[in-house]
Amino acid sequence: MARYIGPKCKLSRREGTDLFLKSGVRALDSKCNIETPPGMHGARRGRLSEYGVQLREKQKVRRIYGVLEKQFRNYYKEAARGKGATGENLLQLLEGRLDNVVYRMGFGSTRAEARQLVSHKAVLVNDKPVNIPSYQVKPGDVVSVREKAKNQLRVKGALDLASSRAPVSWVEVDANKMSGVYKSVPERTELPADINENLIVELYSK
């Protein structure tokens, strides 16, 4: 399945919530009515079946983290093999992706922008270039912006945006050095409360 590159508003309208795909802090503008699903039909959002609710939650999380369907299923399988709650394991794996960590540290204004930085070899992990967005960052790893990329306006702009965003506790960032430490795997209580990972577990358990 190809990665979606169309209007970000359309995805948020599909899920009925702002997925914050346009920037880390900027809400969707007034022209994007997330209460109405995309398309030319009426404004009513159809009532979903139990399966439909589970599917929409999976799609929402997949789109938030920018993960393709096959990748997402593989993450679920890995989460199911791990110790502890499968849903929590799944979210922790998604949070540990390098592109997500770059976003959380404020070097990219969106996960898509962070993914592009990684793909363009603008990011170092423990002083070594890594260009794989799905690379799993480990506690203690140092993630930094490569020297030649530090003057990019998009990186500086992202850091400015990040200063307006509530910081997360599992990363420690030196904005001046454009470097940060992935301190620990986040606990479920530290992750977004508007995600119901149990619905995803129920979906894949069928």
UniProtKB/Swiss-Prot annotation:
MF annotations from Gene Ontology: rRNA binding; structural constituent of ribosome
Entry keyword annotation includes Ribonucleoprotein: yes
Pfam families listed in its UniProt record: Ribosomal_S4, S4
Record's keyword terms, sorted: Ribonucleoprotein, Ribosomal protein, RNA-binding, rRNA-binding
Keyword RNA-binding part of the UniProt annotation: yes
S4 RNA-binding domain: residues covered: 96-156
Stored InterPro entries: Ribosomal_uS4, Ribosomal_uS4_bac-type, Ribosomal_uS4_CS, Ribosomal_uS4_N, S4_RNA-bd, S4_RNA-bd_sf
GO CC entries: small ribosomal subunit
SMART domains: Ribosomal_S4 (SM01390), S4 (SM00363)
Function: One of the primary rRNA binding proteins, it binds directly to 16S rRNA where it nucleates assembly of the body of the 30S subunit.
Family membership: Belongs to the universal ribosomal protein uS4 family.
This protein's name: Small ribosomal subunit protein uS4
Gene name in the database record: rpsD
